[in-house]
């Protein structure tokens, strides 16, 4: 069974989020095309996502020294470990994010801080860091008000690609839902085009899944 982890990072409901609407098209098509696919959806604004703070850094230091964690430290690193476990178990990642000031929302960065973990998803060698995840791929569905594909201002997509490649996930496909603010009279056309691309991609991915 192929496991899909669908992660969205937008406090808006689906009907007000273009990236979520396109992501829902991808996920629903994926499940319709291949019943063996299991999807777990997480909206990062609806769950507890732990940032790296003083307690987390203290806990990491105690792991190395063997000291006991405080209850607060244990709870916080436990939250991060829960996200990490879901991430490691998945075969396919679907990320739906808006662009906010050239990046994605802070909660998405907090999620990545939970899953880029030395000894779990990558390790250090004398030749440098090596990703530990194999045979996984990712889809990034990104909503932007302007046109940012292929520009240096799209830090979010570039960062996500580099972060995933760092842990061994080098197959990343981006579906851009872009230009809604720049071309408000073409919103329906833009979203429909992105949904068509997402649907075609989902059929391709579903067809490649082996049970």
From Swiss-Prot:
EC identifiers of the protein = 1.6.5.-, 1.7.1.17
Q: What is the purpose of this protein?
A: Quinone reductase that provides resistance to thiol-specific stress caused by electrophilic quinones.
Specify the protein name. Answer: FMN-dependent NADH:quinone oxidoreductase
Catalysed reactions, semicolon-separated: 2 a quinone + NADH + H(+) = 2 a 1,4-benzosemiquinone + NAD(+); N,N-dimethyl-1,4-phenylenediamine + anthranilate + 2 NAD(+) = 2-(4-dimethylaminophenyl)diazenylbenzoate + 2 NADH + 2 H(+)
The GO molecular function terms of this record are: electron transfer activity; FMN binding; oxidoreductase activity, acting on NAD(P)H as acceptor; oxidoreductase activity, acting on NAD(P)H, quinone or similar compound as acceptor
Q: Which HAMAP family match?
A: Azoreductase_type1 (MF_01216)
InterPro entries associated with the record: Flavodoxin_fold, Flavoprotein-like_sf, FMN-dep_NADH:Q_OxRdtase_AzoR1, NADH:quinone_OxRdtase_FMN_depd
Q: Name one Pfam family in it.
A: Flavodoxin_2
Alphabetized PANTHER family for the sequence: FMN-DEPENDENT NADH-AZOREDUCTASE 1 (PTHR43741), FMN-DEPENDENT NADH:QUINONE OXIDOREDUCTASE (PTHR43741:SF7)
Q: Where does FMN bind?
A: 17-19, 99-102
User: Family per UniProt?
Assistant: Belongs to the azoreductase type 1 family.
Enzyme class comes to: oxidoreductase
Q: How is the cofactor bound?
A: Binds 1 FMN per subunit.
UniProt keyword annotations, A-Z: Flavoprotein, FMN, NAD, Oxidoreductase
Cofactor(s) recorded for this entry are: FMN
Q: Where does this protein come from, organism-wise?
A: Exiguobacterium sp. (strain ATCC BAA-1283 / AT1b)
| Subunit note | Homodimer.
């Amino acid at each position: 069974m192929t496991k899909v982890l669908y992660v969205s990072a937008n406090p808006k409901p689906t009907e007000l989020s273009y990236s979520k609407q396109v992501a829902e098209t991808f996920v629903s098509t994926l499940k319709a095309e291949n019943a063996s696919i299991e999807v777990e959806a997480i909206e990062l604004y609806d769950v507890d996502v732990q940032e790296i703070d003083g307690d987390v850094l203290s806990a990491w230091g105690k792991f190395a020294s063997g000291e006991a964690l405080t209850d607060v430290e244990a709870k916080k690193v436990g939250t991060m470990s829960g996200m990490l476990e879901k991430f490691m178990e998945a075969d396919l990642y679907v990320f739906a994010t808006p662009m906010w000031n050239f990046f994605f929302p802070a909660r998405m960065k907090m999620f990545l801080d939970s899953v880029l973990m030395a000894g779990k998803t990558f390790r250090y060698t004398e030749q440098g860091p090596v990703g530990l995840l194999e045979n996984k791929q990712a889809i990034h569905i990104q909503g932007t008000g302007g046109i940012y594909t292929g520009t240096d201002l799209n830090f979010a997509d570039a960062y996500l690609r580099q972060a995933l490649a760092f842990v061994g996930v080098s197959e990343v496909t981006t579906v851009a839902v872009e230009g809604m603010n720049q071309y408000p009279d073409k919103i329906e056309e833009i979203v429909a085009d992105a949904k068509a691309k997402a649907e075609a991609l989902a059929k391709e991915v579903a067809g490649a899944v082996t049970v």
